[in-house]
Each structure stands twice: as structure tokens, then as C-alpha cells.
A protein has these predicted regions:
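Structural alpha/beta surface segment adjacent to cysteine/selenocysteine redox centers
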Residues: 17-126
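C-terminal cap of thioredoxin/glutaredoxin-like
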Residues: 2-34, 112-113, 117, 121-212
Length: 212
């Protein structure tokens, strides 16, 4: 079965919005998805900020231009989420999503079904502000809720998992990846869910006219 590589990050609302359409694309076109984490370094291009509980700015290292981009991004994502009955609540800080990403690598070893269940759980709860992706106990619970075995996860997180996560990120950047969601089809990079119709058209055309 043909494999499409998908880079994702749980702290990206755009990756959340792309998840289900990517599932549908794979099911329709008969391809396998190889989900890989790409942990975004948001402060490097959007600055950083932390909000109080009432939404006021507690600390900020953002320019006015960066604030406009961030505010528009959340408005745009909520607009799309509302059309699909999803909840996207703006975060109060920039989260380190690498722990949840290493959780993805852990459950991936236990099958596609538990990987989907884990991602569904983490994305939905995180964007409702119901899940702390920086808490290892919370991620262990998410692993169990997905039907995966969490025994040994902490050792994996501290050693092999962290090394694998960092190596995947470095390899992704060497291949040109800079954001999520990113899909790689036969070595060709597509960034953003707006390219899913093009990928679908390409895959279905190739499926209808297989190479001799």
C-alpha cells in the first residue's frame, strides 16, 4: 500500500483542522498514513506571549505585526472549526508539545487504530483547554484512553523517544518542512490543508491509471 507522510503538531490549530480531512483522504484513496511529529518553534517566527486567566496580556515578546497574525489565525481557525462543530479555544501560552509528540511515536508502535484514537483524544481535549500536554501523567492517561499500553513510556520519553523525536525534526527540516500540517507525496512537499484537494486529485488519477 502506498504511504503518505504527514507531519503534525498538537499545538497547531491548523493541524487539528486538517486531521479528519486527511483521514478521509487516506480512506478514499487507499493510502497508508505515516504520521510524524514536527514540533513547531513558534517563538522563532511569531514571538511569544502569556495571557492571564481573563485574557489580558501578562507577558509579551511579540511585535504588533505578530499579534495581528496570531489574532487572525485564531479567528480563521475558529471560523472553520465552528462550521464543523469543533472547539478551538485560544491558548494562554506557547506550549511545549514535544511530550505529546513523543506520545504519538509511542502509540504508533502499537497500531494505526490506537494512533488515531490518541490523536483524536489529544487534539480535541487540548483545544478545549481540558488537557495539559506538558504533564507526563496526563499523556500517560491519554495513551491508555486510546487503548495503548503506557507501561515503559516514561523510560522511552527520557531516552529513545526524545532522541527519535529530535532526529525526525532534523530530518524533516533537511527535507524542507517548516510547518504543519505538511504532507509528503513521492518526495513532493505540500504544506497546509488547502492542498488536500490537489493531493486527492493526484492520487485518484494515479489509481485510475496505474503505471505499466
Amino acid at each position: 500500500m502506498r504511504t503518505i507522510t504527514v507531519y503534525t503538531d498538537y499545538k497547531s490549530p491548523y493541524a487539528y483542522l486538517a486531521k479528519d480531512p486527511i483521514y478521509a483522504l487516506a480512506d478514499e484513496c487507499g493510502v497508508r498514513l505515516d504520521w510524524l511529529p514536527y514540533t513547531l518553534d513558534i517563538p522563532s517566527y511569531l514571538g511569544s506571549a502569556e495571557l492571564n486567566a481573563d485574557g489580558s496580556v501578562a507577558r509579551s515578546q511579540r511585535t504588533a505585526h505578530q499579534w495581528r497574525r496570531v489574532r487572525y489565525a485564531y479567528m480563521d481557525c475558529r471560523r472553520q472549526a465552528n462550521k464543523r462543530g469543533l472547539t478551538i479555544r485560544g491558548t494562554r501560552k506557547i506550549w511545549d508539545s514535544s511530550l505529546a509528540a513523543i506520545g504519538l511515536l509511542w502509540v504508533k508502535r502499537q497500531g494505526d487504530a490506537v494512533l488515531r484514537a490518541y490523536s483524536d483524544h489529544v487534539f480535541e481535549r487540548f483545544w478545549k483547554r481540558e488537557l495539559d500536554i506538558e504533564d507526563v501523567a496526563v499523556i500517560e492517561t491519554a495513551i491508555g484512553a486510546a487503548g495503548a499500553d503506557a507501561a515503559g513510556f516514561r523510560d522511552y520519553l527520557a531516552g529513545e523517544g526524545r532522541e527519535e523525536h529530535d532526529a525526525i525534526r532534523a530530518a524533516a527540516e533537511s527535507a524542507g518542512v517548516f510547518g504543519v500540517p505538511s504532507l509528503v507525496v513521492d518526495g513532493e512537499l505540500y504544506w497546509g490543508r488547502e492542498h488536500l484537494p490537489d493531493i486527492r486529485e493526484r492520487l485518484l488519477a494515479e489509481k485510475a491509471s496505474p503505471a505499466p
